[in-house]
Amino acid sequence: MITQDKDFLKNTAYPLLKSNAEFLLDYMVIDPRNNYLVTGPSISPENSFRHQGQEFCASMMPTCDRVLAYEIFSACLQSTEILNVDASFADSLRTAISKLPPFRISTNGGVQEWFEDYEEAHPNHRHTTHLLSLYPYSQITLNKTPELAKAARKTIERRLAAKDWEDTEWSRANMICFYARLKDSENAYNSVKQLLGKLSRENMFTVSPAGIAGAGEDIFAFDGNTAGAAGIAEMLLQSHDNCIELLPCLPKEWKNGNFKGLCARGGIEIDASWKNSQIVNAVLKATAPIEFTLRLSNAKLYCWKLNKKTFIPKIKDDGLIYISMNKGDNLTIIIP
C-alpha cells in the first residue's frame, strides 16, 4: 500500500482486487503438460512469435500474464491479511501463487516473453510487456533475482539494438524506468534526453512518431509525459521491497539538485537536496505508522534527528538502516 489508507482498501481497492482475482481463478487452468496454473489462449500485447514457419500471437501463459496474475493474487492476499477477512479465499490465493510458472531465460539471454522459447517475429517491437516484472513491479530486482535482472538488461539491449526499433514516446519512457531499476544512470539519462529531445515538442508534449504502428503523422500521446516523469522520480527515489533508497540512479549530469514531495511506498513523503552527488539534507515525513529500511551511502557521516531530537539509527553490516516512525513523525538527515 502506498498510503496505508485502510478505508480506501476496504471499500474500494479490495473489492476490485478480489473480483479480479476471482476472475483469474475461474479463467486459469492447470496445464496438463507441466501442472502449472496458466492463462490462455492469451497474448503479449501487440507482439507475435514464429512457430513451425508461421507467425502467431496467441499462446498459453505469456510472461506478462504470469506477472499480472502474481501481482493481483499477491495484492489481494496482502489485503485479506490487513483487513482480516476471507481466510478461505486467501488460502486459494496462496495455492494459486504456488502453481504459477517461474520466469525463464531465453537462449538469447533475455527474459522469455512467452512460456515457450519462441523466436521473436519482431525483435524491434515497441512493447516489452514481460518487463512489467522489472517495473513498475518488483518481481525482478538486482538484489533478489540478479540473474533475472541480467536477463532483463539483455532484453532491453536487444530491443534497442534491433534494426528500426520502434522508438515511441512511451517505449522510450519505459527505458528510463527500466534502467532506473537496474541503477544504470548513464543509460537512464540518455533515454531522458531522447524523450525530451526528438520525442517532445516545444510545449513539452511527447509524441509517437509517424511511421510506427501505422501512424501517418506524429501523434500526441500523454503517456510519454507521465511515464517519463515516473522514470525520473524512480532515478531519484526507490521504495520497493520495503526499502527506501535516495538517489539510486543519479547521473553525473545531475550532481547538484533537490526534490520535494516525492512519496515512498508505505506512507513517507520525502524532500531532499544533494551536492556533488551526495545527499546533504533530507526530511522524511511519515503520513502513517511505518517500519522500513533505508539505504544511504556513508550513513554514519550524517546527523540524524527524529522530531528535532537526536536520533541514533541502527545501521547494520549490510549498510541498511532500520527505522520505525509514527504518523506525523519527521526524520531529518543532514551533513553536519
Residue ranges and their predicted role:
Residues 19-79:
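Acidic/histidine-rich catalytic neighborhood
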Residues 26, 186-336:
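Non-catalytic C-terminal accessory modules of carbohydrate-active enzymes
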Residues 50-52, 147, 283:
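Short conserved micro-motifs at the rims of enzyme active sites and ligand-binding pockets
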Residues 58, 124-126, 260-263:
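Short Gly/Pro-enriched turn/cap motifs at secondary-structure boundaries
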